[in-house]
Every structure is written in C-alpha cells, then in structure tokens.
Regions:
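Conserved catalytic core of the tyrosine transesterase superfamily
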Residues: 1-294
C-alpha cells in the first residue's frame, strides 16, 4: 500500500506539477483512508470496492468530520483511483459512484471596524519586529491579498510614490491601491527597518523574519494569532480574516462587486458574491436587534 501511495505522490509531483499545498492535502487524505482500511478492511488498495469507500464516508460522518472535509476526501480518493486506472491497477474507479456530501455554506468570520483598529494597533512600534509586524498587518487589510501573496511580495512590487502594490497569483498580476496609513507603515519599514533585518543584502523579499530570510506562511500565522491574543478579540482571527473583512467593509461602504473581485483576484465573481450575503445577514441582524417591533 505504501509503495502505491508513494508512486502516486511521485506522479502528482512530477507529471501533474501539483503545488506543495495540494500534494500535502491529497496525501493526508489518502493516508487517513489507508489507516481506516488497515483497521476495518485490511486489503490492497486495488481491491477496494465502492461499498468500502461508502462505508468510509459514513464513518467520517460519524466521527463528526465536516461536509467539506468529507467531500475533499472523496475527491482525493477518486483522483487516486483515476491514476490506478491509467497505470492498469484497476479497470474501474470504485469512488466514481460515491455521492459527495453537500457542503454547508458557512459565512466567513468578519471583524468590525473597531476590531480591525484594535488588531492593527497591537504591534508595538518600538523595535524592528514591531515596525515590521505593523507594516504587514496594515498591508494585509489595505489590500485584501492572500497570505501566500503577502509572503511572496518582493521589494520591487511596492510603489510608495504611487501608493500601490503588484500582487501575483497563478501567473496573473493585479494592481491594488494603498491607503495613506499603509503607505506610511511600509515606507518606514522599507527605508529604516528592513535593511537592518536582512541577512543577505541581495535578498529580494519584502518581508523577512528575524533571521533576515523570507517570511514563511507558518511564521506569519503565528504573528496573527499572537496579536489576536494580545488584542483580546474572541473571534478566531486568521490571515484570511483580514481579507474577508477588507471585502465586506468595501462593500458596506459602496464599492461595486466587480472592483472588489478584481482587487481580490477572484477568477469567478461567484466567489466574490458570498460577501453580499454576509452584508445582508449583518443588516438583518442589526434590524432584528434595533427595530422596536422586530
């Protein structure tokens, strides 16, 4: 079993050119499926039937796994058996007839304007780390970019004079404006702080860790969780929370959906439309609480 999974992982990496995140997600799902098989249905992967996979889906549901997790796991298993069909291990895909679970649509966590101000005020601008963290958080809320885009930014992607950044995702570039407070925070960081942090003068990364190397996704996540704790905000704040809040606050203040779609880098406007539902839900909640006859 381990050999077949290793071959499939090699196929994803070399033939499909899967990203590290995609690779990790697929293999995590498949290793969990393999553990289930080992415990409840000891058999080689090519002998697995549709009934076995359906049983696994029911088992995950019984364990309280979310609909999104179950649906993703089915997709991972289906992809594995598509590969087995190509390699001649199986003649039919046993996962093909397994029904996906309907995903519940959860609205993203949104910070209020006051919560954003409180959160952005947490970094203490008294040392290099404080100035760097303040610049990162201001930039994230100013632009709504993804954390992967934030840590991929290079110094040349920022135009302080024109107040914008260039963000890139999946080979596409977009220009996103910056508000004055973000420009001010970035300017101080880039001119006064970043040069002190660099381990290598040739480093191109805009944001670096305290060792002078490009900031990692995990490193930034820890920074966000730290400031959530110091701010005393009960909502679960992730790097994506500021992206969601950016979109909703723009929408609440009159921005059109197409412009928000462009700034967020959504290929399909349906991905952006969820924010209209968030705004409507917020208005309904306000109405229910404030109207004397509600």
């Amino acid at each position: 079993m381990a050999d077949l999974l290793a071959q499939y992982e090699e196929y994803l990496a070399t033939e499909k050119h899967a990203s590290q995140n995609t690779l990790s997600s697929y293999m995590r799902d498949l290793h969990q499926f393999a553990v289930y098989l080992d415990e409840f249905h000891p058999m080689p992967l090519p002998q697995v039937t549709q009934e076995v996979i359906s049983g696994y889906v029911a088992w995950m549901g019984g364990k309280g796994k979310s609909a999104a997790t179950i649906t993703r796991s089915i997709a991972s298993i289906k992809s594995l058996y598509t590969y087995f069909q190509m390699s001649g291990e199986v003649s039919a895909n046993p996962a093909k007839g397994v029904a996906a679970v309907k995903v519940e649509h959860k609205f993203p966590e949104i910070l209020t304007g006051k919560e954003v101000e409180l959160f952005l005020d947490q970094p203490q601008c008294v040392d290099a780390k404080g100035y760097r963290d303040h610049a990162m958080l201001e930039l994230l809320y100013a632009t709504g970019i993804r954390v992967s885009e934030l840590i991929s930014l290079n110094e040349e992607d920022v135009s302080l004079s024109a107040s914008f950044i260039r963000a890139q995702s999946k080979g596409k570039e977009r220009i996103i404006p910056l508000y004055p407070a973000a420009v001010k925070a970035l300017s101080h960081y880039m001119k006064e702080v970043r040069p002190q942090l660099l381990a290598d003068p040739e480093e191109t990364a805009l944001f670096v860790n305290m060792n002078g190397e490009r900031m990692s996704r995990q490193g930034f996540w820890k920074i966000v969780k730290h400031y959530q704790e110091t701010a005393g905000i009960s909502k679960d704040i992730t790097p994506h929370t500021l992206r969601h809040s950016f979109a909703v606050h723009l929408l609440e203040n009159g921005a059109d959906l197409r412009s928000i779609q462009e700034m967020l880098g959504h290929a399909d406007i349906s991905s952006t439309q969820i924010y209209t539902h968030v705004v409507k839900k917020h208005l309904k909640d306000v109405y229910q609480k404030a109207h004397p006859r509600a």
